[in-house]
Amino acid sequence: MGQVLSDESSRHLSHEELTHELASRFADKCFTSLEIYSFKDVFKSLADNQGGIRYLKEDTLARFLEIPDILHVSPVVFQMVSYIGAFPFLQNAPAVLGLDQMVMVVVIMTQRHKRVLAKGATDRAKLLFKSLAVHDRTASEAAVAAEKSSKEEQATQSQPRSHVAGFAVDEPVEEPEDDDDDLEIAAFELLDINDAVWQGDAPKVQGAMIPADNFRKLLMLLILIAPLNAQERLSMYSTRVTGDELDSLRATAEHILAAFLNVEKAPGIKFSQYNRVLPVCFPNLFSGFSPLFEHFLFSKNLDFTKHKGEEPVAEKQPEEIVQPLLPEPGEILNLNVLSQLSFFLPGSDLFRRLRPLYSGNKDGFSTGSFEGKVFNWRAPTILLVRGTRIDDDPRGSQQSTFAASIPPRRFPSGSKGERLTFGVYVSTPWKHTAKETFGEGDTVLFQLEPVHDVFPASRYNSEFISFTKAPTNRPMLGVGCPHPRPSQAHRRNEMLSLGSVSLLLDDSFEYGVFNHDWTAGGGAFATSVSRKFDFQDRFEIESLEVWGCGGDEEAKSQADRWAWEHREAEARRKVNLGTGDNDADRALLEMAGLVGSGRSGGSMA
């Protein structure tokens, strides 16, 4: 849709003309002809007209995307799209959302820009930060002061890595806030114009920050839309924004927000923290925007079942039956936690593909029950454990026994919250470990509550999972812990070792400890990118769950089983007995095998 412009001729074109040229190229390369038709039809049906200019308003956008009013996030989303709509001339933001501007929004929000702007394919996260950020001098100064205070606090908590002076590269340094906007530069190169001429005074990330309250609201929306696909409407999840479900949604958003900043000390998120945390802890955070904004590419006016010349028939279509995201909620895993997991694990392995394998409160808190329920599952698994923080001084004989089995505590707690939730993703089947650990390099250790944190597997240490039992070894379940030595009579009271970043559960699944030795490092899992200090959390276990992540066969079997159960339930619901036609009723019961052949079908009295 348009020939390549030369640098000389494009200098004489206005921003509007160049934007139209880029929008045309985006539409040609990123949309099918049917999607272009649908997009124009949807825009025409939604747009307001003022002075011959057609544009979208905030309430129109929110209504079309079905964003729940209770989240109060519509102004935040509109700020984002108004900024992105000005692409690539971001100095002109906020933009009036006309047809060309909405092409920019839909292409970028659905990540289809990668088909055209290969150079800036990884720069979308930075553009989203800038679309959410504000430039407020007072707030920025407060954020800088809070960050400085946090660093000083971390410095006092952490000890030097060695008594011997190390290399300068070992010392923590402030990451520079890179202002090379690859996505915009790639767009200028596509138009064959000099980006230095056109960038002007485009907003920079230095001094910019995302207000904490705005990001909290956006997180609630992102949790809600995480399982969405392009054929689903957001209104399908309306029950998740009422009552206890809404409270759970807010709580999950708070845990995620805590990964980016301490809300008690900082008013917003700086780019350095955002850029450090996002790739490790939330690589899929914004993935839900893709199906949400793809709704602009489906027009309700397109009906391929109607023949030319026929009048539309006002017939109510049967409501589509959708398989639930979870077969049943667990004590730890609910729909909000499921979305939280999808921010760093592939959603294709989670939504409608999980199966409960083991629950401590149902199956018993013992290694034997765990083995019987989990060891035969041949696909990946997710272990989740939740507990309540215990005091430094043991209370009672059981806590004292647990405290004596691990090294003395020397680190402070990692957070203020009393309830703690940890987990591990394991791609290989579980087994007993007599001498060495098991697990692959895609094993992930993580924390979900009260601070979301992710600890990827290290490339230098493979002590991922230990599951030992007597009499060969001292019984324990360890993640990132050195494998215990074989038991001997004189060693039975020997303490268990904790890894630099590790999770250990005792043999009765009564107590656990998470250790984060940031100073030492070098363990099976990487240290935290957001909490750069040493900490340790000891807790009494309340819930322990293991979920199986179905492979293709397991997922198909689960979907078929659910569909069969739904059909059977629907068939039973539709059987209407007691209508007065006894012969018809009896015939139905005989077909079901409930009467006949000696069965009376009478009362149970």
Curated annotation (Swiss-Prot):
<dbReference type="GO" id="GO:0006979">
    <property type="term" value="P:response to oxidative stress"/>
</dbReference>
<dbReference type="Pfam" id="PF07534">
    <property type="entry name" value="TLD"/>
</dbReference>
<dbReference type="GO" id="GO:0005634">
    <property type="term" value="C:nucleus"/>
</dbReference>
<protein>
    <recommendedName>
        <fullName>Restriction of telomere capping protein 5</fullName>
    </recommendedName>
</protein>
<comment type="function">
    <text>May be involved in a process influencing telomere capping.</text>
</comment>
<comment type="similarity">
    <text>Belongs to the RTC5 family.</text>
</comment>
<feature type="domain" description="TLDc">
    <location>
        <begin position="331"/>
        <end position="550"/>
    </location>
</feature>
<keyword id="KW-0963">Cytoplasm</keyword>
<feature type="region of interest" description="Disordered">
    <location>
        <begin position="145"/>
        <end position="164"/>
    </location>
</feature>
<dbReference type="GO" id="GO:0005737">
    <property type="term" value="C:cytoplasm"/>
</dbReference>
<dbReference type="InterPro" id="IPR006571">
    <property type="entry name" value="TLDc_dom"/>
</dbReference>
